[in-house]
From Swiss-Prot:
Belongs to the eukaryotic ribosomal protein eS27 family. This is Small ribosomal subunit protein eS27. The lineage of its organism: Archaea, Methanobacteriati, Methanobacteriota, Stenosarchaea group, Methanomicrobia. One of its GO terms (cellular component) is ribonucleoprotein complex. InterPro entries: Ribosomal_eS27 (IPR000592), Ribosomal_eS27_Zn-bd_dom_sf (IPR023407), Ribosomal_zn-bd (IPR011332). It comes from the Archaea. The keyword Signal does not apply. One of its GO terms (molecular function) is structural constituent of ribosome.
Length: 62
């Protein structure tokens, strides 16, 4: 059977900070700069659409 329900293109991401190894959940289409809550390193920057992720993505959450 065909699935006719549209799914959103934006996703939540589980990422790991490269400096302090902290795991954090962020929004993939964030409109503001996202920083690590522990060390303050930039994890993602907005680009007008999807964010530019500057760290390691562990998992894409549904």
């Amino acid at each position: 059977m065909v699935d006719y329900i549209q799914r959103p293109k934006s996703r939540f991401l589980r990422v790991k900070c490269n400096d302090c190894e902290n795991e954090q959940i962020i929004f993939g289409s964030a409109s503001r700069k996202i920083t690590c809550v522990v060390c303050g390193r930039t994890l993602a920057e907005p680009t007008g659409g999807k964010s530019t992720i500057t760290t390691h993505i562990l998992e894409v959450l549904e």
